[in-house]
């Protein structure tokens, strides 16, 4: 949790847990204090004249004299927690990652079951995704139907991606497997030239489609979608799939109405095989929400951050109160 003026405070993820051995020292000090109080009582009981004892004993309640010691022990406990180095999860923007946006431009994307059409809605939502993605991420764009084409190689130039989205053209058939293999090749190419680490940058494919793969018809074919998804899994590249449309979509081809229902099952299977997540959207608003969710997942990474400062501040406050209490409660005034 995060408290005002104190910052994040947790009791987990200790970086230096061996500092808790200092608690034995604190326990020893508490035991010593108790022994000193018992010895003090024994010395006071040596007075045979109880009237004399009452005249020299403090008039105020004796329990208040323990407040400074209690606050001191509390401060030591708080300092011990701080020294043990508690940590908390911190989300920071990624500055070294590759995302390939793979969009289906087959004829089924002409369907108007999503206003104004599946394609236009896809373009608008993808532009929003490009705008919101953290600046350090390299974003690439692939359009596919019967073949897959890299329209924009992974780059931090968002305008290039948005301009390419405006120029998407319809084509026949749907070769989802080829599109995934093309995305993996683009990721491997840019990963070889991006510096900043000893390992390739983290990568992800965002696959947007509305229908079944038609080329090849068997997704387990060597060039099929399921085979490509397994390859992505082997290369550590999860695929986030978005199936877009409704079961009632249709297009007019040669003056004939052709039903083009959305195919959720294939997309879910692709995501599952690759180790990614699947989403579905039937409206532009839902699609925007999906892209926003993906942006939060892809654009940020979670690291361990220091959470000891709040405990240090509380410890310092307790120590200051202990000193103040010692001055106010245990002061000696002349009589």
Curated annotation (Swiss-Prot):
It is found in: Cell membrane. Its main location: membrane. It is a multi-pass membrane protein. The chain crosses the membrane at residues 18-38, 67-87, 309-329. Keywords: Cell membrane, Membrane, Transmembrane, Transmembrane helix. NCBIfam families: PRK13685.1 (NF010238). This is UPF0353 protein MRA_1491.
